[in-house]
Amino acid sequence: MKIIHVLLLVAVVAITMSPSIMAESVAEADKPGQAKKIGLFDQIDKAAAAFMKLFEG
């Protein structure tokens, strides 16, 4: 039961953070000299980084 709660919490955090993560990746891609980062794995990486920032303090 606890595993289900943890998975639901992760899903809710991922859904609520997704628009800001997408906006950040678009802003980074618009910078000169930056390669355009598009893909599921890049979004997962950004979501994991944002999730870890929540628990840093």
Swiss-Prot record:
Stretches assigned to coiled coil: none
Keyword Endoplasmic reticulum (UniProt): no
Disulfide bonds: none
Modified residues (Glutamic acid 1-amide): E56
Protein localization: Secreted
UniProt keyword annotations, A-Z: Amidation, Antimicrobial, Secreted, Signal, Toxin
Pro-sequence residue ranges: 24-29
Gene Ontology MF annotations: toxin activity
A biological process from GO: venom-mediated paralysis in another organism
Tissue: Expressed by the venom gland.
One Gene Ontology CC term in the entry: extracellular region
Signal peptide: 1-23
Keyword Secreted assigned: yes
UniProt function note: Induces paralysis 1 hour after injection into insects (blowfly L.caesar) but does not appear to be lethal.
Protein name in the entry: U13-myrmicitoxin-Mri1a
Annotated organism of origin: Manica rubida (European giant red ant)
Lineage: Eukaryota, Metazoa, Ecdysozoa, Arthropoda, Hexapoda
